[in-house]
């Protein structure tokens, strides 16, 4: 009985804290502007690096969402060293400009092959792409950083890396190199150190082989996945591209479930948060109903699911309302399961600050230090 009472208190506090955070998030103009670009080496010497980002993308949302006050953050990705990106571009490409819609970003990242046989590493071209293609904030107080992740000789290619760094610095962009360790490359490590020194950043190192595994600690991940799938089925797609977006919702769940069950929980929290809820009126009938209760009558029935397209208007309205309340119920059940796990982990002493040298841990640690310097409280786990 006492354990149940403690759980209810813990759940109340969690919901109270979460609601406070979403209030701040809704007032984005008052938050600290943070632009983060991951500039990734996708050559053979960095095979597997892309997995470090895409498998932990939701870790970044989870980190930022628990900061107080919540920053006005955006994430973008530039990649280099793939021949498919074109010699004229220095084998570099902007994968996704700065933004907050992480689901399409995740979808794009999982389409990139993680391994190739070779590739030319033109770091200067990669940074030039960050300079010319990324829509950096004009806010003079913004934190604007590039996590330059890779290895090899930084002087290769036609771009003058020093001149490019000067132009980035003039825009207030700081480079934080993260070197992927390769035996016998002491000379190139010094080059990466020089980038950090000249840009005002700090050099870190990681091993791409490093991985950490989720501690389920008795958590019923299969039951959680079943709830999550039911939650996804409350989304009623419509319109041009509606089915594609609904499929993306499910695909990204499957991707992260296979690779990182901790990230799977973070993504579930994202989907029940104010960052996602009522934000999909362009393709979901339930969110459209929130926006305009009669707008569903004007949608093209041919774009609906087989179940919905056969319904009369009054039946479809009733079905939308049913799915609306089912979504609320499932959101609460998902939150309950996560809160119960967090309480159990805390009681069992399973909550620790992550220290392993992986891309997500190193970069989040850097972000924490930068935000704390701006008097923003950030989580340590």
Positions of predicted regions on the chain:
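DG-centered beta-turn motif at the end of beta-strands
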Residues: 41, 77, 127, 143-155, ...
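Solvent-exposed loop/turn segments at secondary-structure junctions
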Residues: 42-46, 80-86, 114-117, 151-156, ...
């Amino acid at each position: 009985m006492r354990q149940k009472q403690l759980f209810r208190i813990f759940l109340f506090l969690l919901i109270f804290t979460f609601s406070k955070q979403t209030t701040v998030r809704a007032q984005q103009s008052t938050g600290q502007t943070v632009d983060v670009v991951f500039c990734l080496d996708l050559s053979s010497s960095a095979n597997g690096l892309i997995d470090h980002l895409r498998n932990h993308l939701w870790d970044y949302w989870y980190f930022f969402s628990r900061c107080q006050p919540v920053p006005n953050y955006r994430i973008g990705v530039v990649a280099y060293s793939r021949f498919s990106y074109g010699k004229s571009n220095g084998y570099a490409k902007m994968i996704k400009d700065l933004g907050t819609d992480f689901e399409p970003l995740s979808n794009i990242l999982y389409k990139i092959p993680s391994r190739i046989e070779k590739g030319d590493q033109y770091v200067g071209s990669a940074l030039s792409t960050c300079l010319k293609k990324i829509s950096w904030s004009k806010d003079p107080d913004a934190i604007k950083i590039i996590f330059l992740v890779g290895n090899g000789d930084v002087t290769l290619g036609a771009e003058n890396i020093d001149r490019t760094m000067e132009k980035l610095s003039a825009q207030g962009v700081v480079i934080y190199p993260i070197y992927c360790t390769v035996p016998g490359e002491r000379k190139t490590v010094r080059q990466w150190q020089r980038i950090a020194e000249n840009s005002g950043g700090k050099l870190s190192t990681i091993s791409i082989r490093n991985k950490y595994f989720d501690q389920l600690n008795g958590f019923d991940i299969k039951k959680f996945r079943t709830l999550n799938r039911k939650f996804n089925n409350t989304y009623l797609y419509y319109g041009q591209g509606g089915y594609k977006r609904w499929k993306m919702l499910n695909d990204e769940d499957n991707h992260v479930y296979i690779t990182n069950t901790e990230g799977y929980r973070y993504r579930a929290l994202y989907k029940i948060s104010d960052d996602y809820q009522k934000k999909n009126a362009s393709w979901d009938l339930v969110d459209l109903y929130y926006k305009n209760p009669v707008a569903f009558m004007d949608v093209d029935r041919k774009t609906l699911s087989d179940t919905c397209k056969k319904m009369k208007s009054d039946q479809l309205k009733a079905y939308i309302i049913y799915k609306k309340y089912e979504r609320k119920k499932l959101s609460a059940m998902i939150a309950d399961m996560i809160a119960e796990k967090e309480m159990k982990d805390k009681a069992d002493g399973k909550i620790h600050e992550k220290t392993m040298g992986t891309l997500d841990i190193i970069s989040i640690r850097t972000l924490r230090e930068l935000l704390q310097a701006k008097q923003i409280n950030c989580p340590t786990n």
